[in-house]
Every structure is written in C-alpha cells, then in structure tokens.
UniProtKB/Swiss-Prot annotation:
Further details from the record: Heme 1 (or BL or b562) is low-potential and absorbs at about 562 nm, and heme 2 (or BH or b566) is high-potential and absorbs at about 566 nm.
Subunit structure: The cytochrome bc1 complex contains 11 subunits: 3 respiratory subunits (MT-CYB, CYC1 and UQCRFS1), 2 core proteins (UQCRC1 and UQCRC2) and 6 low-molecular weight proteins (UQCRH/QCR6, UQCRB/QCR7, UQCRQ/QCR8, UQCR10/QCR9, UQCR11/QCR10 and a cleavage product of UQCRFS1). This cytochrome bc1 complex then forms a dimer.
Name of the protein in question: Cytochrome b
Lineage start: Eukaryota, Metazoa, Chordata, Craniata, Vertebrata
Chain sites annotated for binding a ubiquinone: H201
Record organism: Brachylagus idahoensis (Pygmy rabbit)
Topology of the protein relative to the lipid bilayer: Multi-pass membrane protein
Length: 379
C-alpha cells in the first residue's frame, strides 16, 4: 500500500513541498533564511495574537495597555519583547535572504523574485504600523513624519495624507486603522509566502554555483529538515538572548514617553532596520526627490534581472562583482549608521556620498563588472 502522505490530497501537498521535494545537494547555510523567515512570521503572528488580546487601540489607553501587558499580564513582558525583537530578527533574516538572492543570481527566477519584493514592502509596512501602536513619542512622531512624506505627491498629496490620517493630524482614527492593518497584513503576508513558494517550486531552488542541479538532487527530508532545525535553534537562541538580556537594546528610549503632539523629540528616527532608507531619504534636499529615492532604494531590486548581463548566474566565480557586492553591504551599513545620526556636518556629506554609491554600484558598476568578467572568460 502506498504511503498516506503520497495519496491524501492535503498531505500530498505538504509532502511535495517539505518532504519529498528534490533539492540541490550543495545549497549552503545561506539557503536557511527562507525557512527562518517562515519561523519569524509564525512567532510574530502568535505573539501578536496574544498581545492583541490585551491591547487597546485608543489614543487615551494605548500606552497604558502596553504598560499593563508588561506589568500585569502573565509573561506579558516576554510576549511583548519577543514580538518587538522578533521584528528585528525578521529583518535580519530578510536582508540576508535578499542579499543571498543578489549574490547567487536567484533573481533570474522572475516571479519568485517579484513576489519577494512585494513581500518585502508588505513586511516593511506592517513593521512601520506596528511601531506606531505603543503610542510613545517615537511612535507618534514617526507616524507623523513618514505619513507626511506622501504630501510630496503633486496635486493629490495633501488630500491623500489627510485621508490616511482620518483627520487633520495623526490621532485616534489613525491609531485604530493602523491597528486594523497591522493585524490583517501578516495573514496577507502568509498568503503571499504560499505564492512565493508555489513559484519557487515551479523551477526548484538555485544553488551556490548557479549551475542547474537537476542531475544531482537529494530529498528535502531528512537532509534539509535537520539543517533547517539547526537554523531554528540558532535563531531562537539569538532571539532569546536579546529578549532576556537586553530587550531594549534596539528600541528607542523616547518610546517610553507617552505621545505628546506639543513636544517634538530632538531626533526623530525609525527602528534600526529602516535607517538605511531613512538616510537615503534625508540625503536629498528636496521633499519629492527624497521620497522617490526612498521608494527606489527598495524598488531598485526589481531591475536586478534586467541588469544581469553576466554569462554566469552566480557571483561565486566572479571576483570583481564579489568585491562590489561586499562594498554594497558596507555601504548599506554606513547608511544605517548615518540614518541614526543628527543632520549636521560631516554626517550629511557621508550620507550623500553613501547614497550615490548605493545607486551607482547597482545601476552602473555591477553591470560594468559583468562586462569585464565576460571579456575575461574569452581570454
């Protein structure tokens, strides 16, 4: 008799995507981040669900309800900090996952890549709205500054911002709708993840060499299930270290002050995972230009497949591109640092140089490097 996992309509789907899935025999730890992102999403949905049971999305009680969760709810502090730091781990995995895709040329799987970009935008939107919910100073002013950016859109900008706010400033209506969106988006993300995987399984996984691996496949289970579990353990260890030893390390002290529309904090800045984009936004001395640069800093991922002119898919055997890739990583770290600094000399100039370098590497230098490497192949 055939095994039930191969015949049962529901189990058959699970079997084809998690058990008997043919996987390349040489995928490295960089391929762990997909499953780690799945784990992060599950952690966020579960902790978020329990937080939502005790949270109130009203301007008068939001801050107090978060305090109540931390003080009076059983292990509420743990749930709250798991959720807050879980978001940080989520973005660490996200950026590693995207970086892996760029390095090994995974963006040639167009549908998978494009769904991935939509997922990135969705996760960023969710994280932004979640940051507003505790209704501290940085929540309020972050929401005010970022939503205000939409007013740079010609003609409809101001109307659009007031429509999003549900009034003439960030207030009760804004908080309530942000809570509603913050609750629903993770489930939309989960659905998009299914589509992401559906498209991935049409082609199969890429591998470090960038060479088709159809001639050398191994079953996902037990080889990669055990490898994924090791990743899960390491991620959980890191998250628990963060939550139990320094839960506020990545947060902003200003968010422990209740929101006050009459008092602007000296330095308004987003969470660390948005600082690179924030630095790019600030480095352009024009509102609309800054907003366009901000959107393009992420949307530029969509043109990677168009700029791929190398004869090799992966960067594994392309030393010039490798050097440029790691300069790009260093540049993003520089931008992240600049995003957290005040707008004054020399940070302004460093930010502008780093922003120009970011776009130059992607749009000009990497394609040029590919041309040179193609030439070298002929010698």
């Amino acid at each position: 008799m055939t095994n039930i996992r191969k015949t049962h309509p529901l189990l058959k789907m699970v079997n084809h995507s998690l058990i008997d899935l043919p996987a390349p025999s040489n995928i490295s730890a960089w391929w762990n981040f997909g499953s780690l992102l799945g784990l992060c999403l599950i952690i966020q949905i579960l902790t978020g669900l329990f937080l939502a049971m005790h949270y109130t999305s009203d301007t008068l009680t939001a801050f107090s309800s978060v305090t109540h969760i931390c003080r009076d709810v059983n292990y509420g502090w743990l749930i709250r900090y798991l959720h807050a730091n879980g978001a940080s781990m989520f973005f660490v995995c996200l950026y590693m996952h995207v970086g892996r895709g760029i390095y090994y040329g995974s963006y040639t799987y167009l549908e998978t890549w494009n769904i991935g970009i939509i997922l990135l935008f969705a996760v960023m939107a969710t994280a932004f709205m979640g940051y507003v919910l505790p209704w501290g100073q940085m929540s309020f002013w972050g929401a005010t500054v970022i939503t205000n950016l939409l007013s740079a859109i010609p003609y409809i900008g101001t109307t659009l911002v007031e429509w999003i706010w549900g009034g003439f400033s960030v207030d009760k209506a804004t908080l309530t709708r942000f809570f509603a969106f913050h609750f629903i988006l993770p489930f939309i993300i989960a659905a998009l993840v299914m589509i992401h995987l559906l498209f991935l399984h049409e082609t199969g996984s890429n591998n470090p060499s960038g060479i088709p691996s159809d001639s050398d496949k191994i079953p996902f289970h037990p080889y990669y299930t055990i490898k994924d579990i090791l990743g899960f353990l390491l991620l959980t260890l890191l998250l628990l270290l963060l939550v139990l030893f320094s839960p506020d390390l990545l947060g902003d002290p200003d968010n422990y002050t209740p929101a006050n529309p009459l008092n602007t904090p000296p330095h308004i800045k987003p969470e660390w995972y948005f600082l690179f984009a924030y630095a790019i936004l600030r480095s352009i001395p024009n509102k609309l230009g800054g907003v366009l640069a901000l959107v393009m800093s992420i949307l530029i991922l969509a043109i990677f497949p168009l700029l791929h002119i190398s004869k090799q898919r992966s960067m594994m055997f392309r030393p010039i591109s490798q050097v440029l890739f790691w300069i790009l990583v260093a540049d993003l770290l520089t931008l992240t640092w600049i995003g957290g600094q005040p707008v004054e000399h020399p940070f302004i100039t460093i930010g502008q140089v780093a922003s120009i370098l970011y776009f130059s590497i992607i749009l000009i230098l990497l394609p040029l490097a590919s041309l040179v490497e193609n030439k070298i192949l002929k010698w």
